Structures are given as structure tokens and as C-alpha cells.
Amino acid sequence: MIELKNVNKYYGTHHVLKNINLSVKEGEKLVIIGPSGSGKSTTIRCMNGLEEVSSGEVVVNNLVLNHKNKIEICRKYCAMVFQHFNLYPHMTVLQNLTLAPMKLQKKSKKEAEETAFKYLKVVGLVDKANVYPATLSGGQQQRVAIARSLCTKKPYILFDEPTSALDPETIQEVLDVMKEISHQSNTTMVVVTHEMGFAKEVADRIIFMEDGAIVEENIPSEFFSNPKTERARLFLGKILKN
């Protein structure tokens, strides 16, 4: 389980996260939505130790993150898929996928490559194993990034707006891969996204944020058909029209 307990985050005097209390259960698919600047990405980055909280606690598998242990804990339990793919340009797709398992988890090259091909098959890119990232489309690069996160076999995968940097025509291929993972895997997923169709189909629970706070929390069927707050109704009214 990942827990945020009374988490506050400041950038200077700007109060970015305001008393966030949130838990993510093992195997859950949690989707965080809200307008730009609402604190969604900061929340998910705090879960992974990429941002230090100003006050409160982040707890991963009953371990409280601090500046001394957060790298060790997050390397063990959390994988992250970013808006931008962060692939190593000088390495092939296969090398990108095997680097962390071999270097950090001390897997043999044979075992790491077997795992890499397994997940390249999941994302539909086995034929791209020996090419370099620059030869791939944005959608293909993001699918490689997802495969890389799966190769680490960590129990939590955090997705920070994984389609926001993609051309519209490539967004669906990435969403399809994420849907496949959600249906076939016990992996816990936390997804920050503006893709409402994906949220409806995949989420076990929706978190709606505004101005650094959790405004509403509900199951998708209730959230999308009958939101409890006026702010969520206004947000959905605008975003579902587009």
C-alpha cells in the first residue's frame, strides 16, 4: 500500500499540496484527474520520492519515506512512466529495458533479456528490440517506457500524464497498452491523466483534485454520472464536451 498522510508541499510561499490524505491499495487502479495546476503530478511525484513533502508522511509498504531511505525504497517498490519518455538515446530498446534489472537488481543478461522480450511482446514492439529510440514514434517510445517499467517487476507503477506529450493519433496505442496491463496484471497502477474514457474504463477509483486539494473521491460510475461537487460537475461538463 502507498499512503499519503496529511501531506503538504510548498514551493517557496506557494502552497502546492494541501493536507493530502490518500491510500492506494495493493492491486488497485487509481486515476487522478483535475485541471492543470491542481497538484496531480506533484502528488504522484511525492509518492515516488521525486518530490520531498514539506510536512506529513509518505508511506510505501509500511516504510515512511525520508531523505535518507527514499531512493532505496522507491527503487525497490515503485516504477514511473513520465510525460516524456526518458529513454537513453545511445542505447537500443533492448538495452534500455535490461539496464535497471542488470545494474540495480543484479539479474543476469539472459534473464533480463528474456523479461525484456516478454514485455516487448505485451506492448507490441518485439520487432524494435535492436533499434534506437530516435527511430521510433512518440507513441512507440512511450510503449517502450511502459515495457521498461514492467521489466523491473515492481509492485507499483505510477503514470504521470503518459499521453500528454504525444500526437493525437498515437495516444490510443499507448492507452490500449495501459488497458491491457490493467486487465491482465495485479500491478498497482496510479495514473494522472486527462483521458476520461480511459479513466472510466480502467479505474477502480477516481480522485479529483483542484487547487492542491482532493475535492472528490468516488468510483467511476458514480463520479462520471453523478459527481458530488459542483467543481467536479463543471470540470466534467467542459472536458467531456471537447
Curated annotation (Swiss-Prot):
PROSITE patterns with a match to the protein in the record: ABC_TRANSPORTER_1 (PS00211), ABC_TRANSPORTER_2 (PS50893)
Membrane-topology descriptor: Peripheral membrane protein
Cysteine disulfide links: none
Binding residues for ATP: 34-41
UniProt keywords, alphabetically: ATP-binding, Cell inner membrane, Cell membrane, Membrane, Nucleotide-binding, Transport
CDD domains for the chain: ABC_HisP_GlnQ (cd03262)
Gene Ontology molecular function: ABC-type amino acid transporter activity; ATP binding; ATP hydrolysis activity
SMART domains for this protein: AAA
Pfam families the record matches: ABC_tran (PF00005)
Residues of the ABC transporter domain: 2-236
One of the record's GO cellular component terms: plasma membrane
Family affiliation: Belongs to the ABC transporter superfamily.
Name of protein: Probable ABC transporter ATP-binding protein PEB1C
Species of origin: Campylobacter jejuni subsp. jejuni serotype O:23/36 (strain 81-176)
Lineage: Bacteria, Pseudomonadati, Campylobacterota, Epsilonproteobacteria, Campylobacterales
Gene, per the UniProt record: peb1C
